[in-house]
UniProtKB/Swiss-Prot annotation:
Effect listed in the UniProt record for changing C220A: No iron-sulfur binding
Cofactor stoichiometry and binding remark: Binds 1 [2Fe-2S] cluster per subunit.
One Pfam assignment: DHODB_Fe-S_bind
Cofactor: [2Fe-2S] cluster; FAD
Name of the protein this chain belongs to: Dihydroorotate dehydrogenase B (NAD(+)), electron transfer subunit
SUPFAM superfamilies: Ferredoxin reductase-like, C-terminal NADP-linked domain, Riboflavin synthase domain-like
Gene Ontology biological process terms from the UniProt entry: 'de novo' UMP biosynthetic process
Phylogenetic placement of the source organism: Bacteria, Bacillati, Bacillota, Bacilli, Bacillales
Record has Iron as a keyword: yes
Organism per entry: Bacillus subtilis (strain 168)
A GO MF label: electron transfer activity
């Protein structure tokens, strides 16, 4: 983990309230595992005080560039969306433990399931798995057609299905509906998205090897503030820190 100023190479809107930013700097060389995230300070002013955790979508080590995707949900991300090419961003990272790429054997099939802004980490994950000789299938879930992004980026690595809750694009329904409808077969499931989606996947595929990337609000990003704790299945009093121990966990480890 390092703290550095990264240079904005580009910052553009790619879907409704969803932006893609490319940052450049030596800190990129510290990236090790798909599923890690960056903690960004969105302003040099006193407020907003807290950094924003943003997942890493793609890494280009040769160019020292990292791509992040974020949705404008409040003042912090609104300020981030205003950043222009050439500006500097105060970044802490890469943080967290990512997906277990090394545990997926060549020739196996990995089902990658993303919901909303949980889709971006699947891009780098797909790339790493394909390099290992793993077969990849994507199922991406969104609320509506205006929210859809990264379909083509995922498709270059494997079969890709898109579901929208309102049926305005792709398959109608939720990601679990698509998996059943298409009778998708897989050896391991890797997912990132909203808690209700993760909970549904955990329940439906309890007999499978499943890894979930948790989306929790974070304060410090380094495990000191206890803002992102998640209870485990061991007992009512046991917990893990999503920013430090995760954000990726085996499904049976965490209580949803």
């Amino acid at each position: 983990m390092k703290k550095a100023y990264l240079t904005v190479c580009s910052n553009q809107q790619i879907a409704d309230r969803v932006f893609q930013m490319v940052l450049k700097g030596e800190l990129v060389q510290g990236f090790t595992t798909p599923g890690q995230f960056l903690h960004l300070k969105v302003s040099e002013a006193v407020t907003p005080l807290l950094r924003r955790p943003i997942s890493i979508a793609d890494v280009n080590f040769e160019k020292n560039e990292v791509t992040i995707i974020y949705r404008v949900d409040g003042e912090g991300t609104r300020l981030l969306s205003l950043k222009q090419q050439g500006e500097l961003v105060d970044v802490l990272g890469p943080l967290g433990n990512g997906f277990p790429v090394n545990e997926v054997q060549p020739g196996k099939t990995a089902l990658l399931v993303g919901g909303g802004v949980g889709v971006p980490p699947l891009q780098e994950l797909s790339k790493r798995l394909i390099e290992k000789g793993v077969n990849v299938i994507h199922v991406l879930g969104f609320q509506s057609a205006k929210d859809v992004f990264y379909e083509e980026e995922c498709r270059q690595y494997g079969d890709t299905y898109v579901a929208t809750a309102d049926g305005s694009y792709g398959e109608t329904g939720f990601v679990t509906d698509v998996i059943k409808r298409k009778k998708l077969e897989f050896d391991i499931l890797l997912s990132c998205g909203p808690t209700p989606m993760l909970k549904a996947l955990k329940q439906e595929y309890a007999h499978k090897e499943v890894y979930l990337s948790m989306e929790e609000r974070m304060g410090c990003g380094i495990g000191a503030c206890f803002a992102c704790v998640c209870h485990t299945n061991e007992s009512e009093t046991s917990y893990v820190k999503v920013c430090l121990d995760g954000p990726v966990f085996k499904a049976q480890e965490v209580a949803l």
